[in-house]
């Protein structure tokens, strides 16, 4: 998907727009996959998987990366999820829980200590605007399925605060708590710094003061 607060260095969907607009951080080509089709690259990790204690998955989007599924399925084969103190952390846009023949929730059932951080900046139509490609109804369906099937896993929202949503963050937080999407403690914020034209600091003074008043 194309989130409005990132760019082609973090999302392949941004590449064509970045080339057309002459964005100054555009890679020479789309960043799609490390050594695509080269399974020998992933097999280098096999001897070390039995000793892994912590994994942090981020992206891009880890749930549509072949490398993610290769390693996680190997860990299941080794029995690491149930019999060891392995801790697993995700940052995901939480838009799609299936990939090819894989199902994330079925995978996660094999692990005891797993934390899912959903990168969500708003709800409804605004969520679909900020992270183009989002279908909010599907995000809700994914959350209810997760709560029903593996309620013991940690789930939290990681919200990027920018000029687009700084005046709505508090309402978004309350809404997510009110509908049971998260517990009150499960909400974190990232202040957008990398894309200066979209920082909250570009807003007029009266809007910045209103944001401060709300917080």
Located regions from the model:
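Alpha-helical packing segments of well-folded alpha/beta enzyme cores
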Residues: 41-44, 71, 139-142, 146, ...
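Catalytic cores of alpha/beta
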Residues: 163-179
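Core AdoMet radical
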Residues: 7-39, 49-66, 78-100, 108-141, ...
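C-terminal accessory regions of radical SAM enzymes
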Residues: 178-215
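Distinct, well-ordered alpha-helical segments
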Residues: 69-73, 99-106, 168-172
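Cysteine-centered iron-sulfur cluster-binding motifs in ferredoxin-type domains/subunits
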Residues: 1-2, 61
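Short, well-ordered alpha-helices that flank and scaffold nucleotide-derived cofactor binding pockets
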Residues: 8, 73, 77, 178
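Hydrophobic positions in alpha-helices of CheY-like receiver
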Residues: 75, 105, 143-150, 176
